[in-house]
UniProtKB/Swiss-Prot annotation:
Designated name of the protein: Insulin receptor substrate 1
Pfam families recorded: IRS, PH
Domain PH residues, every copy: 12-115
Reported modifications of this chain: Serine phosphorylation of IRS1 is a mechanism for insulin resistance. Ser-312 phosphorylation inhibits insulin action through disruption of IRS1 interaction with the insulin receptor. Phosphorylation of Tyr-905 is required for GRB2-binding. Phosphorylated by ALK. Phosphorylated at Ser-270, Ser-307, Ser-636 and Ser-1109 by RPS6KB1; phosphorylation induces accelerated degradation of IRS1. Phosphorylated on tyrosine residues in response to insulin. In skeletal muscles, dephosphorylated on Tyr-612 by TNS2 under anabolic conditions; dephosphorylation results in the proteasomal degradation of IRS1.
Residues annotated with Phosphothreonine modification: T446, T453
Subunit organization: Interacts with UBTF and PIK3CA. Interacts (via phosphorylated YXXM motifs) with PIK3R1. Interacts with ROCK1 and FER. Interacts (via PH domain) with PHIP. Interacts with GRB2. Interacts with SOCS7. Interacts (via IRS-type PTB domain) with IGF1R and INSR (via the tyrosine-phosphorylated NPXY motif). Interacts with ALK. Interacts with EIF2AK2/PKR. Interacts with GKAP1. Interacts with DGKZ in the absence of insulin; insulin stimulation decreases this interaction. Found in a ternary complex with DGKZ and PIP5K1A in the absence of insulin stimulation.
Organism expressing this protein natively: Chlorocebus aethiops
Cellular component aspect of the GO annotation: cytoplasm; cytosol; intracellular membrane-bounded organelle; nucleus; plasma membrane
Regions of compositional bias (Basic and acidic residues) in chain numbering: 594-610, 774-783
Subcellular location: Cytoplasm; Nucleus
Alphabetized InterPro entries for the sequence: IRS (IPR039011), IRS_PTB (IPR002404), PH-like_dom_sf (IPR011993), PH_domain (IPR001849)
Length: 1251
C-alpha cells in the first residue's frame, strides 16, 4: 500500500493501496479519503492503477461516500477470505485484501472515517477507533450521536454488527409476508432486520429471542421464528452468494444468540454448532430490593414512539437531550449511549453495558420511565426500522419488542421486579420470547394489569400453586372452609378477611376478593398481586415449607360427619376445595388440629363447600343435617343409610372399609356397613336427608318395619323403606352372602308407587340382568322359591328377603321371581310382614312386567356384551309372549329368546315347586295363567327355535299330568322312554319342532309319565328332568312360603342310570330334613334365613375345566341344614358322559366346578348312597359340545323325610344336532323351567315317591 502523498492535493488521503475486486479478482488501486476542508465527504475511491491516481490523469473509477454506507463489515466467501464490505443504500461493495492484516488495516481505516462521517469530531474519534472486533455496530451508526449531536447530516440508519445481502425467496414467511427480493439482513446484538434494497427502514425486525432455529444448506440460509415474532411463526429462506457466506451467516447469528443467552440468560440457545437453537428456558429473576417494581411505583405507559423518539434516527441525533430515550436503539453501544470513556469496541458491548447504563441512567433517565428500562442493552436494536410504524405496532401488540425500538415490550421483568437503574439487573423477559411468562411480559404492554398479574418471580415458583386442601372452617379458614394459607409466600398470613391472592399491596383488591368467594380462586396464589418487596422478605425456607404445606394437605375442610349437607346457596362451589365426595375423604382427619391445634367450629353449623357436581339423576343437592354432602353414588353392597357410612366408613363398621376408605367389595357378603343391623339398626334411621345418592339402600333385616330411609328426593323411597327407581343409577356390585340385612324386594315399590320403572341401575346392568317376571310365579313364590339378586346385596331391585340375598347371577337361579314378593304371615322374619299390604297385587299386565325387574334365567356366553352374565330377554320374545298371552289369555311373560351360546354355563335354578302351585283356583283352571301372585302357577313359555347348547336341570317337584292335559298342549317325549318315565312337561310351553339340539331328559317318577309320547326329531341336547311330582297341592301357602324361604335349591343332576339311586336317596332331593336341602355350592349351610344361589358349573366333555371365578356366584345358604353333604362337581355331575351325584360326607373338590366345592346337601339321611348316578342322557348334549348344565332346581317345600327322590326315567340320548320338537306344555312347570330354552334337567319330586 502506497503511503499517502504529502502534497496538498493528497492531504485528505488516509490510506491507499492495491486491492482486488471480489468478482473479477482484478487488482485496483484504492484510495481512502477523509472529509476535506473543501467540503468533500470522506470517501473510498479506486483507480485502475496507482499511476493514474498520482498523475490525476483521470477521474476515479468509482467513489463511494462513506456517509452513504449504513454499515461496513469484514466478510469472507469461497473465493476471498479477506473481504471488507461496504453496504450502501442501493448496493453492496466489497474489496478483497491479500492478507488478514491488510484486511484489518483497511477495515479500521474505513470504520474510523465512517464514524466521522456520521458526525463525530476528531476529539470523539477515539471512541470508535479502539476496537475492530469484526463489527462496526459499536462505533458506527447512531450510537454515538448522543455524545455529540452537532453533526447535521442524518446517517442512513443504525449501525449493525453484521450485514449480509440476501435474496429472500418466495417461501414460507417470505411469501406470506410479501418479503421477496434483495434485502440486507442486518444483525445487531438483539435483533435481525430485513432492510430492502434502496430503503432506509427495516421491513421486518426480528428479535434474536424470537428465532427458534436457523441453519443453512448450500447457498441458502433460513431462519425459523416463533409465534412471538411480529411476523408470526414461520421461516425465512434467503439465498446468498455461496455456501461460505451462508455458513458465516449461520455461525454469526448463532454466536450472537449465544452471546445474548450467556449475558442475560433469558433462555438458552443452541450451545453447539447445530443449525437450531435450544428451546426457551424460563430464567430466574434477580430481585433488587432497593427498587420497587412499577406495581408500587406506578407505571405510566409511554408510547413506543417516545422510546424511539422519532420516526427516524435523526431525532436521536437531533441534539435534544430532552428527547433522550430510555434506551436508544443503539443503547449501550451507539453514539448516544456510549460514554466517551468507553472504547466503543463493537465486540465488547457487555463490558460497556453497565457503565453506559449507570452513566446515563442517573443523569438523563426520565424518572417516570425508570421502571421501563431495567437493562441497557449493549447492542440493542439500532436498525433503520426504528421508524417503521409497522414494527412499532406489531411489537406493541406482540409484546415482544420486535421493533427497532429498544424498548422490548416483553422485557417486562424490569417493570415487574427489576431495578431500572441497576445496570447489572438481568431481565429474562428482556428478550420477550419466553412463552411461559406472559404475566410479566404483558405488564409492560398493559401497565394497568399490574394489579392483577402476578409478577413472575423465580423464588415464588414454589408457592405458585393453589392449596388443594380445604381446611375446615376455623380461625384460619375462610367461611367456606378453604385454607387460609399458613404461609403467606409474601411473609404475611392470609386471613378470612383477605381473599387468596390478595396482599397488603393490593388492599383495594382485597375487599372485593373477600366479598366474593369466587375471587378467592381468581388468582392462582397469594403472589398474584403481591408486591415483590414483600415476596422478597420470604426466605427460601418459607417457600419450601409453604409448598409442602399446600401439597400434603389434600383432605376435606370439614369433619367427616360435620357440616350441613347441601352446598350453601350463598357460596359458589369452589372447584379447588372439595368437601367429602369420596369415602376416603370422610375419614376422621383434622388437618387444622394437626397443623396448628386450632379448634374447628361445630361441624354441624359449618357450611362445607362440596366441590363436586352431583351425579345422581335429576336430584339437586339439598342442604340438610346429614353428616356429609357427598354427591357420589355409593358402590358399597348394601347400606341402610349407607351414604353416611360410606362417606364416613370408619365411624360405623370400620371392618367393612379397607384402609383407603373403600367399601369392601368381597363376595363373601356382609360388605355393607349395615351388616348386622337389625330392626333397630341406627344406620337405617340415619339416612342423610340431603343425600344425593341414587342408592339401592334398603334397611337391614327387620329394619323394614322400624325405619324408613328418609330421602328428600321426591320418589326416593316408598313407605316400605325401599328406594324408588329415580334414586340412583348405580347398582351395588358386591355379592353379599351374609344377607341378613337384605331388604324386601325393591322391585315392588309399595302401593303408592307400584308402577315405577325399574331403577336406573337396572338399565346400567348388562342385558342379562334385565330380568322379566317368571311365568306362573307368585310374588312370594318368586321371592322365596327362587334365588335372585337380592336388594340386600344392593345389586338389583329384586324382590329379595333376607333369605333372598343370593347374589347368584346364574340365569335361571336369578330368574323365576316376581319383583313384588308376597309374604305369608308364617314367614319367620317380622320385616316380611311389612310387605304384606303390597303382596296381593297381581302381576297381570305387561306394564307391570315391564316396570318390574325381570330376572334372567340363563347364563350364556353367546352375548359379547355380557359373556359371563345371563342374557336379558329379547324384545322379539316379549312380542311372542304377548302374542301367546293373547292366545292363552295369560299375562305375557316377556322372555327373550335364549342366546345361541357355545353352552358354557350351567343354568342352576333354585326354586321349589310348591304344592301351592296347584293350590286354590289355579289347580282348577284349565289353562295355566298367572292371575294373582298368590297362585304359584307357572306361566306358559314359548321355546325359542334354534339349537341350544345348554343342558338345563330343572330340579323341582313334578306337576300333575292334569296340568299338561289342561294346557292342551301336546307334550313330546323324546324317544322311547322307559315305562313309567314321566317326562314332566313345562307349563304351556310351545316347543317348536325346530328347536333342535335339545333333548329333554325327563327324570320323573314312573307314575308321572303323563308326557305325550309324540316322537320328535332327535335332539342333540338333553332336557333332563328328574320329575318329582309335587303332590302336596293342598299345602297351605304359609307353609309353602316358609319352606320356600328356607328351601335350599341345589341339585345334583342324575342320569337315567342313577334315577333309581336318586329316587332311593331322598337326601339328594330333599331328604328327611324337609324342604329340598340340595345345595350346589360350597358347604351351603341350609339355615332358615338363608337362600342358595346358583353357581356356574362347567361340564367339559374332554375333561373337567375349572371355570373362571367370575362365572361363579356366591350362594346364600338355605333354611334347613342338611346332614349329608354330597360333593357335587360339575365334572362328577355331568362330566364327560353324565353327572354323578354322590352323597359322600367328605368334602371333595371338583376341578370342573366353577366354585371351590360344590356340595349337594340333601337331607341328613345318613344312609344316602354314595354311588354316582350316571347321566346318560347328558351324553347327547355333550356330544354337541355341551359344556354346561342349566340346573332348574325347583324346591318342594313339603318334602318329608320319608319322601325319596323320584325314579328318573332316562330317555335314550338323542343324536346330537337334532331338533327336539316335543311340544310339551304343562302349566305346572316352574317359570324357571318356562324360560329354559336349552336342555333342562328337571329334578322334580313326585308325591308318589314319598317313603
Amino acid at each position: 500500500m502506497a503511503s499517502p502523498p504529502e502534497s496538498d492535493g493528497f492531504s485528505d488521503v488516509r490510506k491507499v493501496g492495491y486491492l482486488r475486486k471480489p468478482k473479477s479478482m482484478h487488482k485496483r488501486f484504492f484510495v481512502l479519503r477523509a472529509a476535506s476542508e473543501t467540503g468533500d465527504p470522506a470517501r473510498l475511491e479506486y483507480y485502475e492503477n496507482e499511476k493514474k491516481w498520482r498523475h490525476k490523469s483521470s477521474a476515479p473509477k468509482r467513489s463511494i461516500p462513506l456517509e452513504s454506507c449504513f454499515n461496513i463489515n469484514k466478510r469472507a466467501d469461497s473465493k476471498n477470505k479477506h473481504l471488507v464490505a461496504l453496504y450502501t443504500r442501493d448496493e453492496h461493495f466489497a474489496i478483497a485484501a491479500d492478507s488478514e492484516a491488510e484486511q484489518d488495516s483497511w477495515y479500521q481505516a474505513l470504520l474510523q472515517l465512517h464514524n466521522r462521517a456520521k458526525g463525530h469530531h476528531d476529539g470523539a474519534a477515539a471512541l470508535g477507533a479502539g476496537g475492530g472486533g469484526g463489527s462496526c455496530s459499536g462505533s458506527s451508526g447512531l450510537g454515538e450521536a448522543g455524545e455529540d449531536l452537532s453533526y447535521g447530516d442524518v446517517p442512513p440508519g443504525p449501525a449493525f454488527k453484521e450485514v449480509w445481502q440476501v435474496i429472500l425467496k418466495p417461501k414460507g414467511l417470505g411469501q406470506t409476508k410479501n418479503l421477496i427480493g434483495i434485502y440486507r439482513l442486518c444483525l445487531t446484538s438483539k435483533t435481525i432486520s430485513f432492510v430492502k434494497l434502496n430503503s432506509e427502514a427495516a421491513a421486518v425486525v426480528l428479535q434474536l429471542m424470537n428465532i427458534r432455529r436457523c441453519g443453512h444448506s448450500e447457498n441458502f440460509f433460513f431462519i425459523e421464528v416463533g409465534r412471538s415474532a411480529v411476523t408470526g411463526p414461520g421461516e425465512f429462506w434467503m439465498q446468498v452468494d455461496d455456501s461460505v457466506v451462508a455458513q458465516n451467516m449461520h455461525e454469526t447469528i448463532l454466536e450472537a444468540m449465544r452471546a445474548m443467552s450467556d449475558e442475560f440468560r433469558p433462555r438458552s440457545k443452541s450451545q453447539s454448532s447445530s443449525n437450531c437453537s435450544n428451546p426457551i428456558s424460563v430464567p430466574l429473576r434477580r430481585h433488587h430490593l432497593n427498587n420497587p417494581p412499577p406495581s408500587q411505583v406506578g407505571l405510566t405507559r409511554r408510547s413506543r414512539t417516545e422510546s424511539i423518539t422519532a420516526t427516524s434516527p435523526a431525532s436521536m441525533v437531533g441534539g435534544k437531550p430532552g428527547s433522550f430515550r430510555v434506551r436508544a436503539s443503539s443503547d449501550g453501544e451507539g453514539t448516544m449511549s456510549r460514554p466517551a470513556s468507553v472504547d466503543g469496541s463493537p465486540v465488547s458491548p457487555s463490558t460497556n453495558r453497565t457503565h453506559a447504563h449507570r452513566h446515563r441512567g442517573s443523569a438523563r433517565l426520565h424518572p417516570p420511565l425508570n421502571h421501563s428500562r431495567s437493562i441497557p442493552m449493549p447492542a440493542s436494536r439500532c436498525s433503520p426500522s426504528a421508524t417503521s410504524p409497522v414494527s412499532l405496532s406489531s411489537s406493541s401488540t406482540s409484546g415482544h419488542g420486535s421493533t427497532s425500538d429498544c424498548l422490548f415490550p416483553r422485557r417486562s421483568s424490569a417493570s415487574v421486579s427489576g431495578s431500572p437503574s441497576d445496570g447489572g439487573f438481568i431481565s429474562s423477559d428482556e428478550y420477550g420470547s419466553s412463552p411461559c411468562d406472559f404475566r410479566s411480559s404483558f405488564r409492560s404492554v398493559t401497565p394497568d394489569s399490574l394489579g392483577h398479574t402476578p409478577p413472575a418471580r423465580g423464588e415464588e415458583e414454589l408457592s405458585n400453586y393453589i392449596c388443594m386442601g380445604g381446611k375446615g372452617p376455623s380461625t384460619l379458614t375462610a367461611p367456606n372452609g378453604h385454607y387460609i394459607l399458613s404461609r403467606g409466600g409474601n411473609g404475611h398470613r392470609y386471613t378470612p378477611g383477605t381473599g387468596l391472592g390478595t396482599s397488603p399491596a393490593l388492599a383495594g383488591d382485597e375487599a372485593s376478593s373477600a366479598a366474593d368467594l369466587d375471587n378467592r380462586f381468581r388468582k392462582r396464589t397469594h403472589s398474584a398481586g403481591t408486591s415483590p418487596t414483600i415476596t422478597h422478605q420470604k426466605t427460601p425456607s418459607q417457600s419450601s415449607v409453604a409448598s409442602i404445606e399446600e401439597y400434603t394437605e389434600m383432605m376435606p375442610a370439614y369433619p367427616p360427619g360435620g357440616g350441613s349437607g347441601g352446598r350453601l346457596p350463598g357460596h359458589r362451589h369452589s372447584a379447588f376445595v372439595p368437601t367429602h365426595s369420596y369415602p376416603e375423604e370422610g375419614l376422621e382427619m383434622h388437618p387444622l388440629e394437626r397443623r396448628g391445634g386450632h379448634h374447628r367450629p361445630d361441624s354441624s353449623t359449618l357450611h362445607t363447600d362440596d366441590g363436586y357436581m352431583p351425579m345422581s339423576p335429576g336430584v339437586a343437592p339439598v342442604p340438610s343435617s346429614r353428616k356429609g354432602s357427598g354427591d357420589y353414588m355409593p358402590m358399597s353392597p348394601k347400606s341402610v343409610s349407607a351414604p353416611q357410612q360410606i362417606i364416613n366408613p370408619i365411624r360405623r363398621h370400620p371392618q367393612r372399609v379397607d384402609p383407603n376408605g373403600y367399601m369392601m367389595m368381597s363376595p363373601s357378603g356382609g360388605c355393607s356397613p349395615d351388616i348386622g343391623g337389625g330392626p333397630s339398626s341406627s344406620s337405617s334411621s340415619t339416612v342423610p336427608s340431603g343425600s344425593s345418592y341414587g342408592k339401592l339402600w334398603t334397611k337391614g333385616v327387620g329394619a323394614h318395619n322400624s325405619q324408613v330411609l328418609l330421602h328428600p328426593k321426591p320418589p326416593v323411597e316408598s313407605s316400605g323403606g325401599k328406594l324408588l327407581p329415580c334414586t340412583g343409577d348405580y347398582m351395588n356390585m358386591s355379592p353379599v352372602g351374609d344377607s341378613n340385612t337384605s331388604s324386601p324386594s325393591d322391585c315392588y315399590y309399595g302401593p303408592e308407587d307400584p308402577q315405577h320403572k325399574p331403577v336406573l341401575s337396572y338399565y346400567s346392568l348388562p342385558r342379562s340382568f334385565k330380568h322379566t317376571q317368571r311365568p306362573g310365579e307368585p310374588e312370594e313364590g318368586a321371592r322365596h322359591q327362587h334365588l335372585r339378586l337380592s336388594t340386600s346385596s344392593g345389586r338389583l331391585l329384586y324382590a329379595a328377603t333376607a333369605d333372598d340375598s343370593s347374589s347368584s347371577t346364574s340365569s335361571d337361579s336369578l330368574g323365576g321371581g316376581y319383583c313384588g314378593a308376597r309374604l305369608e304371615p308364617s314367614l319367620p322374619h317380622p320385616h316380611h310382614q311389612v310387605l304384606q299390604p303390597h303382596l296381593p297385587r297381581k302381576v297381570d299386565t305387561a306394564a307391570q312386567t315391564n316396570s318390574r325387574l325381570a330376572r334372567p334365567t340363563r347364563l350364556s356366553l353367546g352375548d359379547p356384551k355380557a359373556s359371563t352374565l345371563p342374557r336379558a330377554r329379547e324384545q322379539q320374545q316379549q312380542q311372542q309372549q304377548q302374542q301367546q298371552q293373547q292366545q292363552q289369555q295369560q299375562q305375557p311373560l316377556l322372555h327373550p329368546p335364549e342366546p345361541k351360546s357355545p353352552g358354557e354355563y350351567v343354568n342352576i335354578e333354585f326354586g321349589s315347586d310348591q304344592p301351592g302351585y296347584l293350590s286354590g283356583p289355579v289347580a282348577s283352571r284349565s289353562s295355566p295363567s298367572v292371575r294373582c301372585p298368590s297362585q304359584l302357577q307357572p306361566a306358559p313359555r314359548e321355546e325359542e327355535t334354534g339349537t341350544e347348547e345348554y343342558m338345563k336341570m330343572d330340579l323341582g317337584p313334578g306337576r300333575r299330568a292334569a296340568w299338561q292335559e289342561s294346557t292342551g298342549v301336546e307334550m313330546g317325549r323324546l324317544g322311547p322312554a322307559p315305562p313309567g318315565a314321566a317326562s314332566i312337561c313345562r307349563p304351556t310351553r310351545a316347543v317348536p319342532s325346530s328347536r333342535g339340539d335339545y333333548m329333554t331328559m325327563q327324570m320323573s317318577c314312573p307314575r308321572q309319565s303323563y308326557v305325550d309320547t309324540s316322537p320328535i326329531a332327535p335332539v342333540s341336547y338333553a332336557d333332563m328332568r328328574t320329575g318329582i311330582a309335587a303332590e302336596e297341592v293342598s299345602l297351605p301357602r304359609a307353609t309353602m312360603a316358609a319352606a320356600a324361604s328356607s328351601s335350599a335349591a341345589s341339585a345334583s343332576p342324575t342320569g337315567p342310570q342313577g334315577a333309581a339311586e336318586l329316587a332311593a336317596h331322598s337326601s339328594l332331593l330333599g331328604g328327611a330334613q324337609g324342604p329340598g336341602g340340595m345345595s350346589a355350592f360350597t358347604r351351603v349351610n341350609l339355615s332358615p334365613n338363608r337362600n342358595q344361589s346358583a353357581k356356574v358349573i362347567r361340564a367339559d366333555p374332554q375333561g373337567c375345566r375349572r371355570r373362571h371365578s367370575s362365572e361363579t356366584f356366591s350362594s346364600t345358604p338355605s333354611a334347613t341344614r342338611v346332614g349329608n353333604t354330597v360333593p357335587f362337581g360339575a365334572g362328577a355331575a355331568i362330566g364327560g358322559s353324565g353327572g354323578s351325584s354322590s352323597s359322600s360326607e367328605d368334602v371333595k373338590r371338583h376341578s370342573s366346578a366353577s366354585f371351590e366345592n360344590v356340595w349337594l346337601r340333601p337331607g341328613e339321611l345318613g344312609g344316602a348312597p354314595k354311588e354316582p348316578a350316571q347321566l346318560c342322557g347328558a351324553a347327547g348334549g355333550l356330544e354337541n359340545g355341551l359344556n354346561y348344565i342349566d340346573l332348574d332346581l325347583v324346591k318342594d317345600f313339603k318334602q318329608r323325610p320319608q319322601e325319596c327322590t323320584p325314579q328318573p326315567q332316562p330317555p335314550p340320548p338323542p343324536p346330537p344336532h337334532q331338533p327336539l320338537g316335543s311340544s310339551e306344555s304343562s302349566s305346572t312347570r316352574r317359570s324357571s323351567e318356562d324360560l329354559s330354552a336349552y336342555a333342562s334337567i328337571s329334578f322334580q319330586k313326585q308325591p308318589e315317591d314319598l317313603q
